[in-house]
Regions:
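Short, solvent-exposed helix-loop connector elements
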Residues: 28, 285-293, 306-326, 343-347
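Electropositive, glycine- and tryptophan-enriched low-complexity nucleic-acid-binding patches
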Residues: 126-182, 273-275
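Domain-level cores of phosphate- or acyl-group-handling catalytic modules
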Residues: 163-221
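Short, conserved catalytic/metal-binding motifs centered on acidic residues
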Residues: 41, 53-56, 65, 69, ...
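Gly/serine-rich nucleotide phosphate-binding loop at the start of the catalytic core
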Residues: 1-73
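An anionic, glycine-rich sequence signature occurring as long contiguous blocks
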Residues: 205-307, 380
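Active-site-proximal, Lys/Arg-enriched surface segment
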Residues: 71-147
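Long, charge-rich low-complexity segments
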Residues: 76, 81-93, 369-394
Length: 394
């Protein structure tokens, strides 16, 4: 019997994404000419074109003016604290039920968006870090991400202030994920979370974790061996150990895994490399398993790359608007993940087969853009004070 064939259309994608935002953000119509649906059409187009609201309003011929869209957005969004809760509800809006029933591997990372302006109200809004893209000022966001093939959803997002303890950030992210009924079976963390406070909190919360150990301690030289984590970096063979971190009067003990491998031209390097991992709550059977498991965390880096494929450009100092644009990109990415799992995957015995070639993330964004262009039209002219002369004729 011939298999049935179905299609997914751009209208269905647009209605699903818009419904998710309308349901969880409670967006209301600003005016007759600027309804919540029209506002979302403009926002989706700006995300797809990676431009600002101003440029998008100029691109869409019959769209409301840039000032109307700006006022509609400011009027429609709740205050900063309520906005964070609403955005996290939208991120969790498409999570499948099986994902909530069992504990999952999760990754937590910190994402820095370069910023070149002044703070809006509080200097703590601007996060300071190592210089990147010509600045050491950033808007910082931490996110939690489910590490599961085919269902790699971002389940929690929170802004990070200057000087904020990473333990507080991890605690807040796990609380948001718990509200969405997502619980960690294993937490994969970036090296930026390698601290006594974070480790002590996770151990007290009974959350198994795995993260790289930062190379600290005495360097080898002058007849003295390396000390601290640097001593593990000198190992020639893979193995196991333990290490105690000290911060003031507080201490934390972790298990150490050293995985040695040969560099065969990776990153233009050759020779031996020792990768040192700190973990707790696990009983790994090999150092290879530890290294391969931690590599799964790099999926969150892919989500950040896709975030930049859909983040609206802005020069506003308002941290609420900036947070909304970052969350909007992640929500659209979650919509893309949902469509691939629920509608575009092929059924088969065992685990369903993902068919990413059927709809790339950038193609989904273009669908949203084309929907808006079909409604408002595309501006194909611009005003000028000079009269041109047609010099070349066919």
């Amino acid at each position: 019997m011939r298999k049935a064939h179905y299609t997914v259309r751009n209208k269905e994608v647009q209605e699903h994404a818009a419904g998710l935002l309308l349901r969880h953000l409670n967006l209301c119509d600003f005016s007759v000419k600027c309804t919540a649906q029209i506002l979302l059409h403009v926002l989706f187009t700006a995300a797809a074109r990676l431009t600002s609201i101003v440029a998008t309003c100029l691109h869409l011929k019959n769209a409301p003016s840039k000032e109307t869209i700006r006022k509609a957005l400011l009027a429609g969004l709740p205050d900063y604290a309520k906005l964070q809760k609403a955005l996290n509800r939208a991120l969790a809006g498409d999570l499948p039920k099986p994902l909530r029933k069992r504990k999952q591997r999760m990754a937590i990372d910190l994402h820095l968006v370069p910023y070149y302006g002044e703070a809006w109200e509080d200097p703590k809004e601007i996060y300071r870090s190592q210089a990147k893209a010509g600045t050491n000022s950033f808007h910082a966001y931490a996110s939690a991400y489910v590490v599961l093939q085919g269902q790699r959803y971002t389940v929690a997002l929170t802004p990070v202030e200057r000087g904020e303890n990473m333990k507080t950030v991890v605690q807040r992210l796990l609380g948001i994920a718990r509200t969405a009924s997502v619980r960690p079976r294993l937490l994969l963390l970036d090296r930026g979370f390698y601290s006594v406070d974070v480790i002590r909190y996770l151990q007290a919360a009974r959350v198994p974790f795995l993260m790289p150990a930062i190379a600290r301690g005495r360097k080898p030289g002058n007849g003295k061996p390396a000390a601290g984590i640097r001593a593990f970096k000198e190992w020639k063979r893979s193995g196991w150990g333990s290490h105690q971190l000290v911060s003031g009067k507080r201490k934390a003990t972790v298990s150490i895994c050293v995985h040695c491998s040969k560099l065969r031209g990776q990153r233009r390097k050759r020779g031996r490399a020792a990768w040192v991992y700190a973990y707790w709550g696990l009983q790994p059977n090999s150092t290879r398993w530890v290294a391969d498991t931690y590599r799964e965390r790099f999926g969150i880096e892919s989500s950040f790359r896709q975030l930049h494929q859909a983040r609206i450009t802005t020069c506003t100092r308002n941290p609420a608007i900036r947070l909304f644009y970052v969350a909007l990109a992640l929500i659209l990415r979650n919509v893309w993940v949902w469509f691939h799992w629920e509608r575009l995957s092929s059924p088969r015995r065992g685990r369903r087969l993902l068919r990413l070639e059927r709809l790339r993330f950038k193609a989904l964004l273009l669908w949203l853009q084309h929907m808006a262009e079909s409604i408002f039209g595309v501006a194909e002219e611009t005003p000028t004070e000079r009269q041109g002369k047609l010099e070349y004729r066919a």
